[in-house]
Amino acid sequence: MIRVAINGYGRIGRSILRALYESGKRQQIQIVAINELAKPEAICHLTQYDTTHGRFKHTVKLNGDQLLIGDDSILLLNQPDANLLPWAELDIDIVYEATGSLIDRQACEAHIHAGAKQVLISHPSSADVDETIVYGVNHDLLRAEHTVISNASCTTNCIVPVIDVLDKHFEVKSGAITTIHSAMNDQQVIDAYHDDLRRTRAAGQSIIPVDTKLARGIERILPHMKDKFEAISVRVPTINVTAIDLSVTLEKKVNIEQINSVLQRASNGSFNGILGYTDEPLVSCDFNHDPRSSIVDGTQTRVSAGHLVKLLLWCDNEWGFANRMLDTSLAMIQAKLDR
């Protein structure tokens, strides 16, 4: 049994906990503690009730500093300094670092100094971590000695498996990406101040361009793709599910049927459970609560002049990513067992 703690109990932190209870992995992973600065009453309430993912199927209660989920008891902590967290006392194997504020090795090593054995970051990190993992593509790089690991981003997890499949079959020469991302909690409900002037504007009223480092994230996972991709991102007035418009130029000449066939086979084969494929006329809300990293919409595949391919990919940017956090943490422990 892996003993884990969640540091930061926001959208991803809560999704990790809920995903664990729905995924069938509770015999392998135990959430021992949650460190969150919000009030315990709010933590309990938002665990039970969620606008995006619905009501939690398990009963959630508070008992002092314990969050009770069914027969499970999880210690609630309220410690802003990661160096002072009781990870040694609690014998924590892995900390899910989900605050969004600890993004480099030095900051995350506070958890190691506090007694945790490993840290898995739930967002892109600086380059000095031991590895950045997209589960299903490069989790075989995990080693027993690794202590600080990034699980990349939801969009990196969405797009990299598709690029990997296309490259192995048809050789990707270059690509351009537009991420059509649901609104996030770093945006405003109504106009308010923000360092990013575009994010001063009401999230529910505009399509808002934001900066993205997705292209650099692809390079970190697939180093041979360096300088081959560029990306832009816009936020749209939906609360969950993201679409990615991917255009790639391929070395080999292809048609729509070949592209869709290769991706569909991958979804049923080596990427089963990670990559999906659909040819139904679906919309974004149909992918809410989907545990896969990426779903190819085969109805939107286009090929121009035999080499330029356009794809539409879907992902639940919360739920799919939370499930990959669970998968990667199990792979981290397996790497130790394989030592």
UniProtKB/Swiss-Prot annotation:
BP GO annotations: pyridoxal phosphate biosynthetic process; pyridoxine biosynthetic process
Active site: C154
Site residues (Activates thiol group during catalysis), renumbered to this chain: H181
Catalytic function, reaction form: D-erythrose 4-phosphate + NAD(+) + H2O = 4-phospho-D-erythronate + NADH + 2 H(+)
Cross-referenced InterPro entries: E4P_DH_bac (IPR006422), GlycerAld/Erythrose_P_DH (IPR020831), GlycerAld_3-P_DH_AS (IPR020830), GlycerAld_3-P_DH_cat (IPR020829), GlycerAld_3-P_DH_NAD(P)-bd (IPR020828), NAD(P)-bd_dom_sf (IPR036291)
Pathways per UniProt: Cofactor biosynthesis; pyridoxine 5'-phosphate biosynthesis; pyridoxine 5'-phosphate from D-erythrose 4-phosphate: step 1/5
EC number: 1.2.1.72
Pfam family, one: Gp_dh_N
Cited NCBIfam families: E4PD_g-proteo (TIGR01532), PRK13535.1 (NF010058)
HAMAP family: E4P_dehydrog (MF_01640)
Descriptive protein name: D-erythrose-4-phosphate dehydrogenase
Native source organism of the sequence: Shewanella frigidimarina (strain NCIMB 400)
Gene: epd
